[in-house]
Amino acid sequence: MFIDYYSELFSTSNLNQLEEVLAIISRVVPDSVNVDLVKPFLKQEVDMALKQMTPLKASGPDGMLPIFYQHYWDSIGDNVSCVVLSCLNSGTIPTSLNHTFITLIPKLKNSERVSDFRPISLCYILYKLISKVLVNRMKSLLPYVVSKFQSAFQSDRAISNNIVVAFEMLNHMKIKKDG
């Protein structure tokens, strides 16, 4: 029941016209930003990603927390960075690093339906490091692909701001209609 629900929720279908859609989207990333995006990844990026991790965040399949890596980084940092950089610079992640535990967290106190649960993925720290380095690298790209009027993916805005904007627009339209 859970597998069917989430498989359907997180899958896509009817990708027949994907190429046509992509063909009409203009390129908005300047070459200068693209050069930074495709340059080889560096150890400093891995170091920064680890420092940004919450020390006691949920562990992965191995039970390890970021605090272990942060505390012993002087001893293990070179080896860990070597693995992470190998994955990032080759574009491949070994299957052994890609194992994830999926846990369902109830959204409500008395959850009864499948839709009442939120899945979270518990990944290896190495996988999280790879993801964090990629996210940090792509932050420079966001101003070019996310509209300034959009609330999601904006560090200084909350999606809930849209409610206020919508209310103000409706109020303005009502005033124009009445006045």
Descriptions of predicted regions:
Residues 91-93, 111, 142, 172-175:
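Beta-strand elements of modular eukaryotic interaction domains
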Residues 98-99, 143-150:
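A short alpha-helix capping/helix-loop junction motif
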Residues 12-17, 132, 136-141, 176:
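Short helix-capping/linker segments at secondary-structure and domain boundaries
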Residues 115-146, 160, 164-170:
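Conserved pre-motif C helix in the palm subdomain of viral-like polymerases
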